[in-house]
């Protein structure tokens, strides 16, 4: 009989496994987007950066002189409300890294006793919601850094004016020092008007805040801090990082304040969108009569005519324009 050839059975090769997808860890998620000399975002990212953050990034990207800063994304706002008003673990480190980048660009430092960096903290929803959420200016000031600002600017009154504005904004927005149902006026404004009546007893009509001297501003700061302590039971915070944390939380919190909710319902803006938070280096309009703040458009908003249109106030900060503290002047007068 013919012998059968022995055949070796080929062993089946194991199928190659598809490379496992790396799970995105919370620490890998980018929550903070810089703008300035280093810019992460652009105009297409309104959902993530909000309208203001996306536009700031786009302007910086095309080379316009945008003061440096960073945007905390709308994803953090969503996390904030989904997790009992807490933050992702990696957020603090990302914010500190972005602040350090600003410090290097400007040669200033948050809390520094020679060249302090001061910040603004603003909201930035996908669709504009003017005046509905909160803003804080001049963040970073305390009893020491205000002296440094006075020295570095050569303008003591300006420095103390910034400080009293910061205490008023932070006290209201973060610490809840607001008008009570039994009161007719904002408590900070009551303090200002009482103080002006003391120092200008013979004044006829309303006295403009610009008439208050540097030494008088110092006294006003003292009275503001006393008001904060009395109403909130807490001292005004002196640590700039504590101030920044409180301000960011307050801006996210303002997404759900009563006026923002009413506005969203009226204009069909979903609550799920959330708001971004924009942190930016301060530019000052209250250094004297040769500085100012205002609003400008490249076209007339009413007619669409291609003309520079807007209004401004001299020796003022942005909130003065919004609040209508005195009649603004048309931008056309600058020609």
Listing of model-derived features with the role each one plays in the protein:
Residues 2-335:
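Nucleotide/phosphate-binding sheet-loop regions of phosphoryl- and nucleotidyl-transfer enzymes
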